[in-house]
Amino acid sequence: MWAWALLPICLTIWATAGIWIVYGMSVSNGSVNLSDGFPYISLCGTDPPQSCVFGQVLNVGAMLGVWISAIRFQQIRDYNCHSVLNSVSLAMGILCALGTSIVGNFQQSNQLETHLAGAFLAFVIGNIYFWMQTALTYMVKPTHGGCYIGPIRFCLSVACTALIVLMAVFLKMNMKSISAICEWIVAMILFLLYGLFAVDFWHLDGHYFHVKKRTVIPNEMQVSTVTLSI
């Protein structure tokens, strides 16, 4: 059912529009002074009222991220790919979403250490998640999106990794404005990578999760023998 493809598209549009709205609010009310350089995303969402919008945008985005990660995990399993990489990838996707929520709820002006921990989960773990998804793209058959989706994911993951490294390097060199630009580009790439799941979800007929009671395997059943004297 093609409607499932709207889920990752909604996340991409929601998150992209949301953080740029926060940027616009922070600039318009003077919370951010562009003459001091281009601001980090978190700096734009530090002060109210935009901090409220920032938190809501990231919380909804995190919820959608968990949902998408779970559906993608099950979709890969349904293609008879029971690789450990798929399970680890699900964990990475959930951690990325958790970090995103932490970033939105713990502003850097209030809880800097917690905020930075959330940013690490959102950016670094999120990047690792999409590296795993790139690998799974080549492992799973059929491959939706033809021969293009794999290279596109690979190139975007490479760009994301390079920009995260550059972001840290420029920050170390006290070139905060360039570092902030790298951060914004990384965020846009991650949103785009989530949006690419629309290619895979287009082919979903539906999804459901259920809990099964573990059944005892016959070979694992304990056999009791009693010797009777005759």
Curated annotation (Swiss-Prot):
> Can you tell me which residues are glycosylated?
29, 33
Q: Which UniProt keywords apply?
A: Autophagy, Cell membrane, Cytoplasmic vesicle, Endosome, Glycoprotein, Membrane, Transmembrane, Transmembrane helix
User: Where, by residue number, does the polypeptide cross the bilayer?
Assistant: 2-22, 51-71, 84-104, 116-136, 151-171, 184-204
- Which PANTHER family does the protein's record reference? FASTING-INDUCIBLE INTEGRAL MEMBRANE PROTEIN TM6P1-RELATED (PTHR21324), MODULATOR OF MACROAUTOPHAGY TMEM150B (PTHR21324:SF3)
Q: Matching Pfam families, A to Z? A: Frag1
Protein name per UniProt:
Modulator of macroautophagy TMEM150B-A
The disulfides recorded in the entry are none
Q: Name one GO cellular component term.
A: endosome membrane
Please report the record's description of how this protein sits within the membrane: Multi-pass membrane protein
Record gene name: tmem150b-a
Gene Ontology biological-process entries: autophagy
Compartmental location: Cell membrane; Endosome membrane; Cytoplasmic vesicle, Autophagosome membrane
Q: Which residues lie on this side of the membrane: Extracellular?
A: 23-50, 105-115, 172-183
By sequence similarity, the record places it as follows: Belongs to the DRAM/TMEM150 family.
